Curated annotation (Swiss-Prot):
Pfam families: PseudoU_synth_2 (PF00849). PANTHER family: 21S RRNA PSEUDOURIDINE(2819) SYNTHASE, MITOCHONDRIAL RNA PSEUDOURIDINE SYNTHASE. The gene is PUS5. GO terms for biological process: enzyme-directed rRNA pseudouridine synthesis. It catalyses: uridine(2819) in 21S rRNA = pseudouridine(2819) in 21S rRNA. The active site is at D84. The keyword Transferase does not apply. Its EC number is 5.4.99.43. This is 21S rRNA pseudouridine(2819) synthase.
Amino acid sequence: MKPTFLKCLQGIDKNHAYRQINIIDIHSRYLIINKPSGIQCNGTKSHSNYLLPQLYKQLKAHFSANNPNYKLNPDQYKVVHRLDKYVSGGLIIARGKNANAFRKSFSNQNTNLSVKRKYIGLVPIPNTVSFKQHLHEFGDLKVQHENEVRYLNRPESVTDKKGLIFKDDSLTEGIINFDIVALPKDDRRNKNTGELVTYSALTKFKILHSMSQVPTNEQISRFPKLYKNKTIYPIIIELETGRKNQIRDHILQAFKVSLLNDDKFIDFKMVQKSNTANINSEVYNSNQIGLHSAYISISKSSFANEYVIPIPEGDEYLWKGFLDENSFIKTINRELITF
């Protein structure tokens, strides 16, 4: 399907540079949009770094171009899942009465609608070792020699140890099922308890070992604290549960390093609200995280669509070496689709 690009919604990143959001597709049941880093999904303030008010303005302009009397009903467009403010990539905006069906599909309650979301993350590993050597240094690797259905759905008992579980000895594919501990602000059921909340979470992943990149001299010169003595590994991630900050949390727990330019995540996670401009990073020129919502597929009995979402304009530098213009290189695209 040929993407439909509309003129920009505007947003402001940490350095107050205007951003562009492209609408990838307008379907009768949903929209697919490409959110740059720095745009906030929740909130209804009429600020340029809040998603929905800008989306309403853009859609009204689009539909009014063909029908000057068109009246946009904001209640017909619902964000059914979210990306962290400094994560980029594809978002589904449900239209009309479809929002509940999408939300149910994320928890496997809707058998008539199937939605898959895959992400690409960048994991910086010390260049003195390979990723596999880095993993072995933990001394506690678990390899589950079972088929995928079994190892994803095996019943948990009180003796099951949660953590990082690889599918086989190649240390390429696996799951992360650490519990996630969060502030009560992240759990609507426990808003006012003042206690930390623990809940289960499950993440599938595939490390693309052969596609790792050594930062260029120019990258190291510009941002030495981010790139020096590092090798960057791309990793494909698919969520089986949808907890807040789940990918960022699971990467740190499983691999003992944060995603690229997410070095302050552990501090941010335990703060109710921060007015600090450098909330994620002090080593790069923005708060952008090396995490991108790169693939969405939506299927129902009457249709089946899939989307590979490019890196938004202005967010490419962090992904240097993994892109062909602003799209992922072919080998990564192929892995995204087939994983």
